[in-house]
């Protein structure tokens, strides 16, 4: 149904597109149109809070119209791509929503990315504009973007706040340089295809080179509205997602659903415990979440200096729900999601064992799931672990410019292979899903395959441990043995291998799964999209083993 396909993009098969259209999932509305309509419905309500300021929906709508019109003045056109290096500041929303309205495609890079990432992604996506945060602490993104232009190939650099470099456009000047009425007319004159690309998200992966995920206007809109319906987002919702707003979780899990329903989005550049907790208290946040390091630090701070968190109705995390409820005193729910599409949450009425240990059910009745026996397309038996495969109205049909990888990334009948190992359990007539681990994240100890995720879950319960990464270290007898890298809670000492084994024994974990080496770090190395790089951890322990071997034989 797409009018002008973008080369390198895999679009939904015609039959699937027609089916999702008939079901009312995929329609003819773009993200920009939907955001403008929400602004008209909620014009005088607060849309955005950040940087000591507040913006109503009317104000945010006018600003993003002007950004869109300014991009058109610079010579950009729908489907041109924009590298996005703006952190969690209000200007991120000005730029991203302005791109949506102009039909320009944000490439969801991070402010922390440097030449290796941007120097690859900008030419790969053929980006024409590079948005940067000009006042970023400790690094001059304006100078970086200007210096990289010969390699990146972008025509324009646009900066928010801070010092300007020659040839760099100031976002604020672009906004001020165009009349609001003229901007609205320019946006309305565009014919943006809702079936075409709205945003390029980035995959995680283990190769170090992110894969590019095309998400379409109508699929991203449906995804966001489905989350809003599932979670219960309304005009009274006050959302605060402290992690990167540019990530898929921030966009479709929190901020877009809230802005489409007329609620308030809070944004802070810092994510230290006091900022996190005080923002919740001051803004009466109802919907928030975080990852384990954020949660652990918040718990420590809350114990020392309690904040009023009574407004929170939903705290979303990938796991640790019982700990969050116990130590922060707020209702906690689990999420599973991926930039490639499918999203699952637990909900208030789910059975206690689901909320404590599982990730819930998919948000759309049109989501199709198959747990396949790893390496095959064959369904696993109910209750048996299998690779999580899915398709649906908002799930990827193929990575951008990656035909060879796409051959491996999908089943023969077109279901996306996530690489995640899951288990389905039927409770009360409904299937609920539990995340078991990554298929490629197993440790092969002799004849036994050990889930690194399982080891991490149990080790993570030790009181000294803030975060854990389990890997297989090379071993001449077993092939691999279990090694864990730990980040410790403040003031805690690392357990010895024997002490950790005794602790795991009290939890009933089989002895062959116990770690046989412990390493302690302050921070884990990460891939270019912020996930723990287990490849680098394996390299680290392998090098240490080699040095130890040489020391014994030298």
Task: Report each predicted region and the residues it spans.
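Gly/Ser/Thr-rich phosphate-binding loop
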Residues: 176, 282-290, 299-357, 364-368, ...
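Conserved AMP-binding A3 loop
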Residues: 56-58, 198-222
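Conserved ATP/PPi-binding loop(s) of AMP-dependent carboxylate-activating enzymes
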Residues: 346, 362-366, 376-409, 448-450
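Structural core segment of the AMP-binding/adenylate-forming
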Residues: 1, 73-74, 104-173, 297-306, ...
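AMP-binding/adenylate-forming catalytic domain of the ANL superfamily
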Residues: 160, 509-531, 550-554
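Conserved AMP-binding/adenylate-forming
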Residues: 53-55, 67-118, 123, 244, ...
